[in-house]
C-alpha cells in the first residue's frame, strides 16, 4: 500500500483503494495516508449498516481480528462472532446466524446482501457510500476504534523437510476405517 499512500497524499485524495490480484480483498488508505485494514473496514460498514437499519444481527470476524474491534462492537451493542481464518468460515457463520456482514483483517469482506464472497470493488463502493452518508472522511469514521497492540510472528521450524503429521497415526486410522 506504500505507493497508494504516496498517491493519496500527492493528489490530496479522500481515499485510496488497494485491491489484491483477483480483487476479492482490499485495504484502504485515508486522506492522511494511514492504512486501514479489514478490521477498520468492518467497523465502518457495521456502523453504517447499523445507522441505516440494514445490519442484520451482528458481525462475523476471524480469530485474527483485533480484540479492539470486538470491544468496539460490544460498546455499540453489536454482537461479534469469531470463526477460524478463511472466507469459507465467515460465509458459513453468516449463513448460520442470518447476519449479513463479516470479514477478516486481510480485507476479505463479505456483505451478504450484495455478494456471497469477498468482492473488493463492492466493498469499496459501500465504504464510499458510508463516507457520503456520514459526510466524514475515513480517518474520522475510525477515530473511536482503538486496536490492541498485536504482532503476527512466523516461528522458525528446524525440521522443515520432515512432514508435520504423524504417519503412524494416519496408518492406524486408515487400517481401522475402510475408504
What are the language-model segments listed below?
Residues 1-29:
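N-terminal small/polar loop signature for handling phosphorylated ligands or for N-terminal nucleophile
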Residues 15, 51, 55-179:
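Phosphate-binding and adjacent anionic-ligand microenvironments
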Residues 19-21, 35-40, 115-118:
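Short glycine/threonine-rich catalytic loop with a Thr-x-Gly-x-Asp
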Residues 21, 32-33, 41, 64, ...:
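Short, ordered loop/turn segments at secondary-structure junctions
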Residues 24-43, 69-70:
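Short Gly/Thr/Asp-enriched flexible loops that form oxyanion-binding sites at enzyme active sites
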Residues 40-55:
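Structural motif
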Amino acid at each position: 500500500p506504500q505507493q497508494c499512500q504516496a498517491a493519496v497524499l500527492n493528489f490530496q485524495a479522500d481515499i485510496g483503494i488497494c485491491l489484491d490480484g483477483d480483487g476479492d480483498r482490499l485495504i484502504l488508505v485515508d486522506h492522511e495516508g494511514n492504512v486501514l485494514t479489514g478490521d477498520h473496514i468492518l467497523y465502518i460498514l457495521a456502523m453504517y449498516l447499523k445507522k441505516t437499519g440494514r445490519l442484520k444481527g451482528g458481525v462475523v470476524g476471524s480469530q485474527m481480528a483485533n480484540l479492539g474491534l470486538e470491544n468496539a462492537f460490544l460498546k455499540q451493542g453489536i454482537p461479534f462472532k469469531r470463526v477460524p481464518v478463511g472466507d469459507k468460515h465467515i460465509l458459513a457463520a453468516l449463513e448460520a446466524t442470518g447476519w449479513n456482514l463479516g470479514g477478516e483483517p486481510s480485507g476479505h469482506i463479505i456483505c451478504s446482501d450484495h455478494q456471497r464472497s469477498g468482492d473488493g470493488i463492492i466493498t469499496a463502493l459501500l465504504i464510499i457510500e458510508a463516507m457520503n452518508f456520514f459526510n466524514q472522511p475515513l480517518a474520522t469514521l475510525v477515530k473511536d476504534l482503538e486496536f490492541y497492540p498485536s504482532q503476527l510472528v512466523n516461528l522458525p521450524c528446524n525440521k522443515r523437510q520432515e512432514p508435520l503429521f504423524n504417519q503412524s497415526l494416519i496408518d492406524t486410522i486408515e487400517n481401522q476405517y475402510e475408504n
